[in-house]
Amino acid sequence: EYLPTVHGFDEFHGNLYHLNAEEEPEQPDYPKDLPVFQNFFKPRGVLDCKATDVDDPTEDPRFGRVGKQTIRDTGPLTRKRMETIEDDLLARSMDFIDRAHAADKPFLLWHNTTRMHVWTRLSERWHDKTKFGLYADGMQELDWVVGELLAKLDKLGIADNTIVIFTTDNGAEKFSWPDGGTSPFRGEKGLGWEGGFRAPFLMRWPGKIQPGQVLNGIFSLEDVVPTVMAAVGVPDIKEKLLKGYQAGTKHFRVHLDGYNQLPYLTGGSGESLRHEFFYYGEHDLFAIRYQNWKIHFQVKDDWFAGALMRPTVPRPVNLRVDPFEQHMEAPGYPLYAGEKLWTIMPAAYILKLHAETFTNFPPRQAPPDFNPSEMLKHAMSAAASV
């Protein structure tokens, strides 16, 4: 029920998990001979799915009802297969573009590479390509994949009429170095520091977005849907979704926290419409940014083993003055923070407005919480309501 092909996508080909989960069955102490474990916990293989008009009532004991789609498991994503999976994914995307172009149909292609997620398994073609180590070699392969996709648009003569976005979903993962990234910002993926959230975002639309410009306004992945919808002629999708919107056979009534940033990107306005950003990590709100001010409500410095610290008074940082968030460790910081207490109240008000949106649009799914006491609390609450 969660596969893309029952949520608006015509086709889906890919894996469902982070790569380190995919290769877990190859560990020597993995319980290969325990049927219950295999049936309920083993990662699913690389899936090839297509949306259909025929409703398949088949019920899988683990994954649920098939519904209006076909699902073909092409086999596990083993360590060996990881070496060439990028070639497979690229070929699929190239074929999709070719078919859409031949049919003279506009298309949306969401190409997710497995680079650069741990663990990096490279073929001989990319091994030691850069002389800078495993991670740099993987980035070289990623660069090649992007280049091939852009070249395909050029070859078909549709590059000038195609919007291209390159981005990722979090900051660098540093703890797994040398099979991990780096950045000048404090922290990493999973933490509330800038290093956990700042990510590259490149957008190309020839004739509309001026090439070579660097924009420093706040921009979030939440802005992509309203912005791209505006580009294709629906500038008010956010407002329509609030009231209820029919797209094909599906009805949506949702709250998007994004902004239509097309005027900002195309030069129609001088600044980003986004003035705030919420730093969520798992089930915690670490911080809020508004304008240049970032207010830390809780902090930690180790993603997996670090203790979460909730300071009595939230900690303000001016990201224009201290973009790398280093000054909080300075002896003079408490005095500075005391002088800047006025920055906290606007953040509290922004948080209040944010929380009010959950009244009519509550979160659809709670994030995972591996604290056993919380699990027991939820279980007991559910039992009491029966």
Predicted segment positions?
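Short, solvent-exposed turn/loop segments enriched in Gly/Ser/Thr/Pro and often Arg
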Residues: 1, 15-19, 108-119, 166-172, ...
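Histidine-centered active-site microenvironments of extracellular/periplasmic hydrolases
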Residues: 1-7, 113, 118-138, 144, ...
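Formylglycine-dependent
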Residues: 1-105, 113-115, 119-122, 311
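C-terminal cap/loop subdomain of S1 sulfatases and analogous C-terminal strand-loop tails that border
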Residues: 2-4, 10-11, 16-23, 30-34, ...
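A structural signal for well-ordered alpha-helical segments within the folded catalytic domains
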Residues: 7, 87-91, 140-147, 219-226, ...
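Loop/turn elements at helix/coil->beta-strand transitions in domains of secreted/extracellular proteins
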Residues: 7-10, 102-109, 158-164, 198-199, ...
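Short glycine/proline-rich turn/loop motifs
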Residues: 66-78, 124-129, 204-209, 323-330
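Long, internal low-complexity/basic segments
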Residues: 290, 295-296, 301-302, 308-315, ...
